[in-house]
A protein has these predicted regions:
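Serine-esterase "nucleophile elbow" of acetyl-processing enzymes
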Residues: 1-41, 55-63
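Short glycine-enriched, charge-decorated loop/helix-capping segments at active-site entrances
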Residues: 9-14, 81-88, 125-128, 167-169
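Cell-envelope and extracellular/periplasmic
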Residues: 1, 11, 41-46, 66-83, ...
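Catalytic-core regions of hydrolytic enzymes
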Residues: 43-65, 82-95, 103
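A short acidic, helix-capping loop that chelates divalent metal ions and anchors anionic groups
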Residues: 4-8, 49, 76-81, 119-123
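Catalytic His-Asp segment of secreted/periplasmic serine-dependent ester chemistry enzymes
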Residues: 115-200
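Active-site segments of SGNH/GDSL-like serine hydrolases
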Residues: 70, 74, 98-134
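Structural recognition of the beta-strand scaffold that forms the well-ordered cores
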Residues: 37-42, 66-70, 109-114, 148-150
Length: 200
């Protein structure tokens, strides 16, 4: 839902109200002479296994120039009530399958956006599962990504001297401030790849 953000799923160019909207706004304003096409295919509640099922339609068939992936918090959230966590090996296998297929069957550059959790009391216990999965994500990023946004650390930094509720009401779903913050980071990563000659 962080990427989905209420988008109109009948129109993949409609970016909802979350970070994709802000990222596109920044990129368009900083590159006014380039007509970029932005597609948002985020689906609220999806986990890594759902991305595997969507590989053909949402990645391979489209053949994008850049793929950005922000996945993983739901692999933790959906099991939090029972604490019957998905093992890290299965999480990695799912994520690795997605990244391998993108590498092998498209020419897309890959931007991975790390999953994050803000310091809110009722979800602190998520860390017993989430931290290991962030480690997996970072390891996969070193292997597959052209650029990486270490969002968990950056959001932790943003909460120093600023209440977590400034960014998110529940510690997981960004509000307008949080979405703008992530969108800015996305645009910075995009510009970094552009400057390095990885795009275009």
């Amino acid at each position: 839902s962080i990427t989905d953000a209420g988008r109109d799923r009948s129109d993949p160019h409609e970016l909802g109200t979350g970070y994709p909207l802000y990222a596109a706004k920044y990129i368009r304003s900083e590159h006014p002479d380039t007509d970029f096409e932005f597609i948002d295919l985020g689906i609220s509640g999806d986990q890594t296994i759902n991305l595997v099922a969507r590989l053909q339609a949402d990645f391979i068939d489209i053949q994008p120039d850049l793929v950005s992936i922000h996945i993983g918090i739901n692999d933790t959230w959906h099991r939090a009530e029972t604490r019957e966590w998905l093992d890290n090996e299965t999480f990695e296998a799912n994520y690795r399958k997605v990244l391998t297929e993108i590498k092998e069957k498209t020419n897309a550059k890959i931007l991975i956006i790390e999953q994050f959790l803000l310091p809110v009391p009722d979800k602190e216990f998520f860390r017993e599962d989430l931290n290991g999965k962030i480690d997996v994500t970072r390891r996969l990023a070193r292997e597959f990504a052209d650029c990486y946004i270490p969002l968990d650390g950056l959001m932790a930094k943003a909460c120093v001297g600023c209440e977590p509720t400034h960014w998110s009401a529940d510690g997981v779903h960004p509000n307008e401030n949080g979405s703008d913050f992530i969108g800015r980071l996305y645009a910075d990563a995009f510009n970094e790849m552009l400057k390095a000659g990885k795009l275009g």
